[in-house]
């Protein structure tokens, strides 16, 4: 095989390796985000109303329950 053929095959191999590595990183990030959402929503076993969930979702937070009839929103509900 000529030197040019070997260089082309090497280049194709490097491109393949680089793209598969990028895809793996993207897949890992997607899986990590999915796990974080699952954990965030299930930290506390509180019962919430649909109104509270919708109100807090608009603020990009989780409904942690009601206090004096008002929704309590937080990034992570503790206890």
From Swiss-Prot:
Disulfide bonds join 52-64, 56-73, 63-77. Keywords: Amidation, Disulfide bond, Knottin, Neurotoxin, Secreted, Signal, Toxin. The modification Leucine amide is found at residue 78. Its main location: secreted. GO terms for molecular function: ion channel inhibitor activity; toxin activity. Residues 1-24 form the signal peptide. Residues 25-46 form a propeptide. The keyword Disulfide bond applies. The keyword Methyltransferase does not apply. It is found in: Secreted. GO terms for cellular component: extracellular region. Expressed by the venom duct. Belongs to the conotoxin O3 superfamily. The presence of a 'disulfide through disulfide knot' structurally defines this protein as a knottin. The cysteine framework is VI/VII (C-C-CC-C-C). This is Conotoxin TsMSGL-2. It comes from Conus tessulatus (Tessellate cone).
């Amino acid at each position: 095989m000529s030197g040019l053929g070997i260089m082309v095959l090497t280049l194709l191999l490097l491109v393949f390796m680089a793209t598969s590595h990028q895809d793996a990183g993207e897949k890992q990030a997607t899986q990590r985000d999915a796990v974080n959402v699952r954990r965030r929503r299930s930290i506390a076993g509180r019962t919430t109303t649909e109104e509270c969930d919708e109100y807090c979702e608009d603020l990009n937070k989780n409904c942690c329950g009601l206090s004096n009839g008002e929704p309590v929103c937080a990034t992570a509900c503790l206890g």
